[in-house]
């Protein structure tokens, strides 16, 4: 009887896929749902201030849900899956290279509300998967900016002006890889690149999980 009871509890409380609700694999994102994520062509997506920007995946339903769940719905264990998706894409461009990974920072007020910076979590998993070095102290967000998604390109740049502060003492001397979840106009990457170049850091590459221009 006790064995039946524990099996019943396992059915109720076993971890379910956040996407299809299957408990077969007892993971947050089952292999079928992960495999449904589609990569963009493996090439440079755009150039910002002379720096290469790569966008890993098509802005599909599952990738949107993955990012939003991690970012807004306290699904912190989804960070591994986003990091894995990005790492598997980026390995095609980074053979024999070592990067200093810098996640896009969020303001302390927003981090307090969310309980974490989702891109720091992604950065930790990304570096664990790739062997790169994580640096969350090089760039700090000192301005609590408005959400970018409803703003035009010019408004985004104005909104981000003065948003970031660089701590040069925290630079470890490596090639910088800035990572973010979504690259729309590229304004966030551009502002961070500008600030890094002001202190002489010019060896920079950017990587986002997706861009809404490909759905």
What are these regions (language model features)?
Residues 1-215:
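Glycine-rich phosphate/pyrophosphate-handling loop used in enzymes and phosphotransfer proteins
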